[in-house]
Amino acid sequence: MANRTDPLAKNIRGTNPQNLVEKIVRTKIYQHTFWKEQCFGLTAETLVDKAMELDHLGGTFGGSRKPTPFLCLILKMLQIQPEKEIVVEFIKNDDYKYVRILGAFYLRLTGTDVDVYRYLEPLYNDYRKVRQKLSDGKFSLTHVDEVIEELLTKDYSCDIAMPRLKKRWTLEQNGLLEPRKSVLEDDFEEEEEKEENEGIADGSEDEMDQRRKSPERERERDRDRRRDSHRHRDRDYDRDYDMDRDHDRDYERERGHGRDRDRERDRDHYRERDRDRERGRDRERDRRDRARRRSRSRSRDRKRHETDDVRDREEPKKKKEKKEKMKEDGTDHPNPEIAEMNRLRASLGMKPLRD
């Protein structure tokens, strides 16, 4: 079956039962050696043997967040989804305390609110010590009733988010649950019966009647007092639960604000970086334009100078050619009359006069 959920398993709270464990924790469990070697092919019957071998409980630990065998068996139970009767037998098992906690943890994840209170509250009377592995890999001692208290009042246990649980007094008002009875109430009644028997043996009937009446009144007062104390305790549990939930919400809200501030800061940083890049591109573009203008002006000046040099070189040649031409046609004769006659003859196409 590998890591797939049993095809016959029903959805829990509208989703695959394995999804009650967060994906990152699920992935750590799938990659763990205990899951691959010890949990492969387990059924509801063979799971009991593995549960009896547990010697501690806990979630993930160490730098790589390795899962404990307890957490692996929880995921295996979600995968195969044992029947409710088997889970109840786990909880009622007095011989193996870790089997009891395993069943209570699974019922807290998958059971209804009424079943959770009905089967887990009697475990408040189990004061046996259990070992719990902390997140740093060290062990600490706790008690079964403290683990049950954590399951009923906290939002997280063993790195798994607990489903929302209705308040007990709400279920009592709706008639789904009866007021919780303390186990100490039976001890009080036994002591009162002993006192009554001693009073009957020692005193007269008047004293017996008086003692018979007074214990009854005291018993009623004690019952009322215990009932009120239980109700106050339940309200304290609910108040602590609400305070923890509000604290978690405030923490998540602050984390959300912090993420928004980080996003705004990153966005401003990217905008400023883009502006700097645009300024750099503009400066580079201006620098190239100035360089082109300088090169163009230099080329124009160079061409102008070359043209002037050519003109300066050609003017003496033209003057020389003009002088030579004037010598040939006799227009430069020292005698003005002869020079005038030569100009006239040149215009007529005749040879010039030399003397």
UniProtKB/Swiss-Prot annotation:
Give the sites modified to Phosphoserine: S204
Q: Where are stretches of biased composition, namely Acidic residues?
A: 185-208
Q: Which UniProt keywords apply?
A: mRNA processing, mRNA splicing, Nucleus, Phosphoprotein, Spliceosome
Q: Which GO terms describe its biological process?
A: mRNA processing; RNA splicing
> Is the Nucleus keyword given for this protein?
yes
- Protein origin, superkingdom: Eukaryota
Entry GO CC: spliceosomal complex
Does the UniProt entry include the keyword Nucleus? yes
Residue ranges with Basic residues bias: 290-303
Q: Where in the cell is it found?
A: Nucleus
Q: List the cysteine pairs that form cystine.
A: none
Q: Which Pfam families would you find in this protein's record?
A: PRP38 (PF03371), PRP38_assoc (PF12871)
Q: Where is this region: Disordered?
A: 182-355
In which residue ranges is the amino acid composition biased (Basic and acidic residues)? 209-227, 234-289, 304-343
Q: How does it assemble?
A: Interacts with SR45A.
The record's similarity note reads: Belongs to the PRP38 family.
Function as written in the Swiss-Prot or TrEMBL entry: Probably required for the first pre-mRNA cleavage reaction catalyzed by the spliceosome.
**Official protein name in the record:** Pre-mRNA-splicing factor 38
Organism (species):
Arabidopsis thaliana
